[in-house]
């Protein structure tokens, strides 16, 4: 069979002008001239029917007339093999097993074997050709597309040759914007609108040289943007946010289309599309394929596509097909020959089947059908299929194409391509640059987008600024009107420190934002939109006005309320220093986020970093008192330079009088300044009752001469971290596609290995769909006998559902009716937005908002109390506890949802029945995990169904889109399971997204909805859809002979074939509608006259609350036990903070200065809370989302059990954290080591672990999402820290706050108990510099001169030399209790009093978790007659 390789699909259909030398399959050289390039009309395309085809041709002709060279490449690859580290099953360590060092060391020596994910692939896609790559998940389709898109990072080994035109893969790297891949994920900034997203993409791809007749770059961009939006039918979404799971925006299908047109905006020459029709209905998917076909034909693109569930209409638009199985290429050749080739091997393509599904199903025993006479000789697995293909004539024909890159034609096309790209690029760019617009324009466009992102998420921005203003007012009132004497020194220093601290804490959000935007940036980098440096500079440019505003609204209230120096120069110096420090700290955290691969690592480091920088600012530990082993931190700390400059700016040139306990002696009779001196104030000079600001600064090793030096150093640090950010951002890489790997919990490893060993022994040479069965597995009939039979009839009538929107009430369901009987498999279908999921949610009582009218009945009676747990509901999203194994998830559901009268053993036995039914034996002991690290999409779907089945649903089972995102075989498997359930008497109602004809035929009845939830058909489907076909044919829309009836119906009702006809009215006027309503009334009355099929036990939950709590708590404890990342991060935070704190405050003595150091050492313990809460909250909210999404709605267990489980699961680790912090911190600080004191401190630390956990959990319990929680944390923790009596002592707190918030603050009692136990009994020994030294008057002795003072104001002072007549030395305090008295801690019993109050606060914080969770739990809506 000789096939000419330059035909109507081999070369572009326009501008064929050069001579070309190519071999045909007989290896003879054929020279083709311009006119003989094709035997067909080059202007004819299989996509000529596409509405925008004329526009594509017009654009192409305009470019040709403008003298533009064509950008045609083609892709050829040979002997392409890819290896990855084999990760078929990774072991998930638990908290204890991770410390089994000998075992881990033994296992680490066994290097994981390499797995070939793509094996010796070959092919050629010339300009103007489309290749369809088919294969089941894990067969290597995505890997092949990544290789052809020249994205090789993350793979262990890549061998073989890939050529782009005549270029090698290395040469093609500089043209990465012309060889692009659209991945399966939709990665966007959700707060941008569709229009803004497309503005950004199109602006960065406007060519330098414009076609004739185009007025400006903006006109070109606007025209292209309009064309792209029209091409996918989403022009109406231009002002709608893209959105995501948290931010409401366009629908899932529309978001996928935005992803498609953003990729098309690159104007590339080679496109790789990875499952780009996922989430689109068949009509839209076909339109997309036609669009790609049209552009490929006219523009000479090379298009490679991989699809799941491709209909025949889509399949027929391709030129070539490549089929992969286990990485092996079992077919590559013309699309028209693929089906005949497979049929010649003995496989049968069922009538009405999708050919694409047939091609991928030939190696799956449960899917394939063998032609009579071929049973003994058909190829049974991938190796046998490959062997057959290697011998075939198809391969022999295709080999001739592999010379294409060396042909004269390819070389000329490649030269034209290079010239065209050079003309498109801005002249300022270097020749090797992959970008289109120059660097300055990239920055401008990125700055515009940054502001759009901010404006799009106004709520977060406003919350941030309002909380800044609130915090500024609180801080200003806390440090209000600080006096200009020694009493105000500490208060003013605190206010200046807080000015830097708060803005630095806000800057920590940069770490989170870095990871939120990273996937989008990596995608845009692969599209060659902009250089990462442009993105980083744009972020900074966008920061400046925002931070100016933020710093201003913080600085103004704080500065003037505190009463800092009323001098314009001093104020503006303060403002610019706070701004410069904030910019530097923003750069620090942005660099920290950019430098790490995972958020866990970045958050761990940033949390530790902020602690270190705060501690070494110079506020807690003064510069002269820092230990030499950590003093280097001071020199690299931007906060330290800022704090030095702020204090120098404020106190320079001032005279600071000493007052109160800082002045010795003081009071009546001691007015002579020459016999007074200052104590407890740095820089004091004997015999002087004041301190100069510059002496005070010198005592801290500060100087006013450093102010502008430090300002310069701050900007130097800023510049350094910006450079680090740019370098780190430039090195960001996308994750490699290694395929999902199973996770085996350590405690199940042996069982899994034994299971795998049995599998290997029983394995035959034929690949099976199931690797093994559970012990004592029963055959199909035994399983069927054990399944629960349903005898109840479920009906709904005149169902309407209305929701309130800003524009008024909106009706989503309009008088819908229907029924599901036992043994019936019902399909619920309709186009996107028709209300399929809404109807299921209403029927299953899952709605908590809106108004529902109509009747929903079981056996003609109102829904029983137990309905939500008696009916199974498999939602579209597979929501599961990731750290549970499959068996545990099923057992959890069975134990909680089967009736309380059923023995436990019987419930667990039924789990085995369902595991056998759903063929889950080989994954029963693996963790569910998350998508990509755990079960595959199809396996997760089966687990979702299993979780509902084990509950023995006695009424019916709802399933929402169970086949969405699955390949054809997995979808067929899923529906086959559902058919099996219906056959044994279950009632099943399923929403399904465009099934193949084969799947459609499995259903018994159909409810078809149009936009607005209007019914257009309800009734039997008939044999192979005959009844439905007959209905539509009778009303003027006959189904073509080979068309899929399911696709045809959607097209007729709401797609290209609707022709504006109102099918809802057609239905209402039909006899089928009248008969269905009569039948419904008959079913209801008949069912109501009989005893109910389901007996209501009257319980909302199947199990009593106590048993619910035990089962839920056990699961939650096991999940935390296995979540080593979370536990290790918590422990590392405590150990790291404790060691750092302990060594920073090493062996403190008993001087007055060291008393203050002890205060700060204990105060620092409070700061483990922000880091620990930041780790705890996402986990709490993730579990709450699982509970809200599925477990609450199915009445599995009460919210009380949920909260109890979460609280109890944390307790063992909180005890461990307290032990580790205490041991690593306490004994190196010089605090009392006696068991009564140390034991009391440990007990208080243990209570604090519970206190901050309770605070973190009650914020999480009510927060709508994790972002809100992270914005709330600083306000709550910041307020508690501010008013606990440390930053401002009790006596100096303003009266407004002092009499309520101080006493309601748990941190006040925490610090009170810790200080009392550690300082109360200490004898104070002043250092030489701390004494007040002066000469008594008239030669009197010190004791005689000071006797009145020591009995009055100086009662706590300690006179060292009472008999001396000169140089009297007075220490400010005698014992620790004297110092604590100034902090409102008046007796030792205050320690235990405060401990008891902290314990009450712990209980109160946990009570708040229950209370706020109860407040958040809404009741489901019921239908109103």
Curated annotation (Swiss-Prot):
CDD domains: ABCG_PDR_domain1, ABCG_PDR_domain2
PROSITE patterns assigned: ABC_TRANSPORTER_1, ABC_TRANSPORTER_2
Compositionally biased region (Basic and acidic residues): 747-761
Membrane topology: Multi-pass membrane protein
UniProt induction comment: Expression is strongly increased in the presence of cycloheximide, imazalil, fenarimol, pisatin, itraconazole and 4-nitroquinoline oxide (4-NQO).
Residues bound to ATP: 830-837
Biased composition (Polar residues): 27-43
Keywords for the protein's UniProt record, in alphabetical order: ATP-binding, Cell membrane, Glycoprotein, Membrane, Nucleotide-binding, Repeat, Transmembrane, Transmembrane helix, Transport
InterPro entries, per database record: AAA+_ATPase, ABC2_TM, ABC_trans_N, ABC_transporter-like_ATP-bd, ABC_transporter-like_CS, ABCG_dom, ABCG_PDR_1, ABCG_PDR_2
Entry's Gene Ontology molecular function annotations: ABC-type transporter activity; ATP binding; ATP hydrolysis activity
ABC transporter domain boundaries: 96-351, 788-1037
Phenotype caused by lack of the gene: Leads to increased sensitivity to different classes of agricultural fungicides: cyprodinil (anilinopyrimidine), ketoconazole, prochloraz and propiconazole (azoles), carbendazim (a benzimidazole), fenpiclonil and fludioxonil (phenylpyrroles), fluazinam (a phenylpyridianine), azoxystrobin, kresoxim-methyl and trifloxystrobin (strobirulins), 4-nitroquinoline oxide (a mutagenic agent), camptothecin (a plant alkaloid) and the phytoalexin resveratrol (a stilbene).
Pfam family, one: ABC2_membrane_7
Region Disordered, annotated ranges: 14-44, 743-782
Lineage top rank: taxon: Eukaryota
Compartment annotation: Cell membrane
Catalytic activity: cycloheximide(in) + ATP + H2O = cycloheximide(out) + ADP + phosphate + H(+); chloramphenicol(in) + ATP + H2O = chloramphenicol(out) + ADP + phosphate + H(+)
Transmembrane segments: 489-509, 520-540, 569-589, 601-621, 628-648, 710-730, 1161-1181, 1205-1225, 1239-1259, 1267-1287, 1300-1320, 1395-1415
Gene Ontology CC entries for this record: plasma membrane
Glycosylation sites: 43, 79, 275, 390, 484, 672, 790, 1024, 1338
Family the UniProt entry places it in: Belongs to the ABC transporter superfamily. ABCG family. PDR (TC 3.A.1.205) subfamily.
Matching PANTHER family: ATP-BINDING CASSETTE TRANSPORTER (PTHR19241)
Role, per record: Pleiotropic ABC efflux transporter involved in the basal level of drugs susceptibility, including antibiotics, azole fungicides and plant defense toxins. Confers resistance to cycloheximide, chloramphenicol, imazalil, sulfomethuron methyl, pyrimethanil, quintozene, acriflavine, rhodamine 6G, the azoles fenarimol and miconazole, and to the dicarboximides iprodione and vinchlozolin.
Protein name listed in UniProt: ABC multidrug transporter atrB
Species this chain originates from: Emericella nidulans (strain FGSC A4 / ATCC 38163 / CBS 112.46 / NRRL 194 / M139)
Gene designation: atrB
